[in-house]
Amino acid sequence: MFDGIGFMELLLIGVLGLIVLGPERLPVAVRSVTSWVRAMKRMANSVKEELEQELKIEQLHADLKKAESKGLSNLSPELQESIEQLKQAAQSVNRPYQVQDTPSAQDNQIHNPASQTVSTEASSTSASSAPKSESIQGEDPRSNTKANG
């Protein structure tokens, strides 16, 4: 810790501190100085660790770019298989978000008459269910028939 400071220098600093601060304030000053030194060491170590981590990440990115530039031809079969599985998983995740060039629904109805009957049946089913929803919403259905009839 004190590489450049010898025993005589430490003794001189202690005596000067005792003379300047006195015996009452010297222990408090020593504690505060040691806490500052510890905080500085912790901060320096955390910065050092962060820099080392960033350098490792940069090295990994550089290694990946080198492997990619080589065409991944030197990889083992198991590693190539896992890369293919990862690519397929990425494609399956991206697939629902891709915009597909499909013909519009009107084009399907023109070329496929079966879909027209399905859509007509669906609209007739929704039309028959509409009066039921009106009677549920509030008024008595018998009063509607008297007013209509």
From Swiss-Prot:
Protein's UniProt keywords contain Membrane:
yes
Where are the bilayer-spanning segments? 1-22
Which InterPro entries does the entry mention?
TatA/B/E, TatB
- The annotated regions of Polar residues compositional bias extend over 86-113
- Give the primary localization class: membrane
* Biased composition annotated in UniProt, kind: Low complexity: 114-135
Coiled coil spans: none
Its placement in the membrane is given as: Single-pass membrane protein
Q: Which GO terms describe its molecular function?
A: protein transmembrane transporter activity
Pfam families this protein is in?
TatA_B_E
Disordered as annotated region, ranges: 86-149
Its localization reads: Cell inner membrane
The alphabetized UniProt keywords are:
Cell inner membrane, Cell membrane, Membrane, Protein transport, Translocation, Transmembrane, Transmembrane helix, Transport
Q: What does this protein do?
A: Part of the twin-arginine translocation (Tat) system that transports large folded proteins containing a characteristic twin-arginine motif in their signal peptide across membranes. Together with TatC, TatB is part of a receptor directly interacting with Tat signal peptides. TatB may form an oligomeric binding site that transiently accommodates folded Tat precursor proteins before their translocation.
The protein's name is Sec-independent protein translocase protein TatB
What taxonomic ancestry is recorded?
Bacteria, Pseudomonadati, Pseudomonadota, Gammaproteobacteria, Alteromonadales
Chain's gene name = tatB
